[in-house]
A protein has these predicted regions:
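ATP-dependent adenylation/nucleotidyltransferase module used to activate substrates
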Residues: 1-189
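Short, intrinsically disordered, charge-biased short linear motifs at domain edges
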Residues: 185-187, 192-201
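Local cysteine-cluster metal-coordination motifs and their immediate loop/turn environment
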Residues: 112, 116, 196-217
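Short functional micro-motifs and their immediate structural scaffolds
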Residues: 25, 190-191, 214-217
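Iron-sulfur (Fe-S) cluster-binding segments and ferredoxin-like electron-carrier domains
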Residues: 127, 204, 210-234
C-alpha cells in the first residue's frame, strides 16, 4: 500500500508526512509539493529538505496559472498586504464588515484543486491514500473553508467515487487543533527545525502573521521552543 502526502513544508503537512512514513515505510510514501503563485519559495525549499530527511520520493506541480485572477494576499500579483495579526483578529474585522467570510490569505478553493490534482497523480503512481494536514483551527470561523470536516468528507467521497473506489483521502488532524498536531509530531520526532510556516519570505519568520502566531502558540502549548527558530538562530551564528 502506497501513500501520497501533500507536502507544503509547514508544521501540519510535515507531521502528516511523518505519520505516513511511520505507517507505510518511506519506500511507500510520495511527497507532492505544489506551487500556486505564492510570494516566496521558502515553503517549497522547506518541503524539499523534509523529503530529503525522510528519504521519500518527491514530486512537484505548478498550479500558479489557475490562481492568476485571484487577489489573495499570499499571491505575487496581489495588491493586498499580508495581515500582521492573529486569525481571530482578522475574522473579527471581517465579521463586522462583511459577515462570515474567509481571511485574505485564503487561496480560492486551493485544497480542492490540490486534492483533485493529487488524486490523478496518486492513481498514476498506484497510491491508495492521500494525506493532507488540514486542522480544525484553520476551518474555525470560515477562515479557510476548504479545511473543514464537511469539506474533507465531501472531497473524500468525490475522490473515492471518481477513482472507482481505489483512492481515499486521509486528513488525520481535521478535528484537532494545531497544538494537538504538534504534540503528535513531537512524539514521532518530526523535524520541525526544517519546516517553514511564515507567509513572509524573510530570513527568519516574521512572528506577526496569522500562521506565525498560530505556530508559536502550538509549540508554547506543548511547553517547547519552536525548533525552527532555534535552528535558524544557530545557523545564523555559525
Amino acid at each position: 500500500m502506497k501513500a501520497l502526502v501533500l507536502s507544503s513544508g509547514g508544521v501540519d503537512s510535515t507531521t502528516a508526512l511523518g505519520m505516513a512514513a511511520a505507517e507505510y515505510g518511506k519506500e511507500n510514501v510520495i511527497a507532492l509539493s505544489i506551487s500556486y503563485g505564492q510570494k516566496h519559495d521558502k515553503e517549497i525549499r522547506a518541503a524539499e529538505a523534509v523529503a530529503q530527511y525522510y528519504g521519500v520520493e518527491q514530486l512537484f506541480l505548478d498550479l500558479s496559472k489557475i490562481f492568476t485572477y485571484s487577489n489573495c494576499s499570499l499571491l505575487k500579483q496581489s495588491t493586498e498586504e499580508i495581515p500582521q495579526e492573529s486569525y481571530a483578529g482578522q475574522l473579527e474585522k471581517i465579521s463586522q464588515r462583511d459577515g462570515e467570510n474567509p481571511v485574505s490569505t485564503y487561496v480560492p478553493f486551493r485544497n480542492g484543486l490540490f486534492l483533485s490534482s493529487a488524486a490523478s497523480i496518486a492513481l498514476s503512481k498506484e497510491c491508495s491514500v492521500i494525506y493532507y494536514g488540514a486542522h480544525a483551527d484553520d476551518a474555525a470561523g470560515c477562515a479557510y473553508p476548504d479545511c473543514s470536516d464537511v469539506f474533507n468528507n465531501a472531497m473524500n467521497e468525490a475522490v473515492w467515487e471518481g477513482s472507482g473506489h481505489q483512492l481515499r483521502i486521509e486528513a488525520p488532524f481535521v478535528k484537532m487543533n494545531k497544538a494537538d498536531v504538534v504534540k503528535i509530531g513531537l512524539s514521532l520526532g518530526v523535524p520541525y527545525e526544517l519546516t517553514w510556516s511564515c507567509y513572509e519570505g524573510g530570513e527568519r519568520p516574521c512572528g506577526k502573521c496569522g500562521t506565525c502566531i498560530d505556530r508559536a502558540a502550538a509549540f508554547a502549548a506543548n511547553g517547547v521552543e519552536d525548533p525552527a527558530l532555534k535552528y535558524r538562530q544557530e545557523k545564523r551564528l555559525s
